[in-house]
């Protein structure tokens, strides 16, 4: 089963996809946000292209575990997405994933700030999805 991972921000949506065995996540694109309708259309195309059966949406939480304003926006987006796609949409704790992604790009591949901005959301989506996939294998 293929699973889609999303890192939903105000300006962009990072997108990652799993392999068919739901073992390995790979970043595939970053969607520039325009409107809910256009954002969902772009996600729908990916869902159809890869025969996705589930979507994992990174849920930003505060360090104490509470949900703040950004988390509320993401929940609203995910719930609407579930209605449109008619496949399971689950939320996954994304605390520190963007920080992890940025640290990797700085330390791991010594990438410049300009290049980092282009791939950070896709990498964060990959980390979110891989974390989810790993948890499913271990449960």
From Swiss-Prot:
Q: Which GO terms describe its cellular component?
A: cytosol
Q: What is its EC number?
A: 3.1.-.-
Please state what class of enzyme this protein is. hydrolase
List, in alphabetical order, the Gene Ontology terms for molecular function in this entry. Answer: nuclease activity
Which coarse location class applies to the principal site listed for this UniProt protein?
A: cytoplasm
Q: Which GO terms describe its biological process?
A: rRNA 5'-end processing
Sorted keywords for this record are: Cytoplasm, Hydrolase, Nuclease, Ribosome biogenesis
Q: Where in the cell is it found?
A: Cytoplasm
* Highest taxon of the lineage: Bacteria
Question: Which SMART domains does UniProt cross-reference here?
Answer: YqgFc
- Keyword match Ribonucleoprotein: no
Family affiliation: Belongs to the YqgF nuclease family.
Q: What does this protein do?
A: Could be a nuclease involved in processing of the 5'-end of pre-16S rRNA.
Protein name in the entry = Putative pre-16S rRNA nuclease
């Amino acid at each position: 089963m293929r699973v889609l991972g999303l890192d939903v921000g105000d300006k962009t949506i990072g997108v990652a996809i799993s392999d068919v065995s739901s073992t390995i996540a790979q970043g595939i694109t970053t969607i520039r946000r325009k409107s809910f309708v256009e954002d969902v259309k772009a996600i729908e195309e990916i869902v159809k292209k890869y025969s996705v059966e589930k979507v994992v949406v990174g849920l930003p939480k505060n360090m104490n575990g509470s949900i703040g304003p950004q988390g509320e926006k993401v929940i609203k987006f995910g719930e609407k997405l579930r209605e449109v796609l008619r496949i399971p949409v689950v939320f996954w704790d994304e605390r520190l994933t963007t920080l992890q992604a940025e640290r990797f790009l700085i330390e791991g591949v010594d990438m410049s700030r300009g290049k980092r901005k282009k791939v950070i959301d896709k990498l964060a989506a990959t980390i979110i999805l891989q974390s989810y996939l790993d948890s499913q294998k271990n449960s």
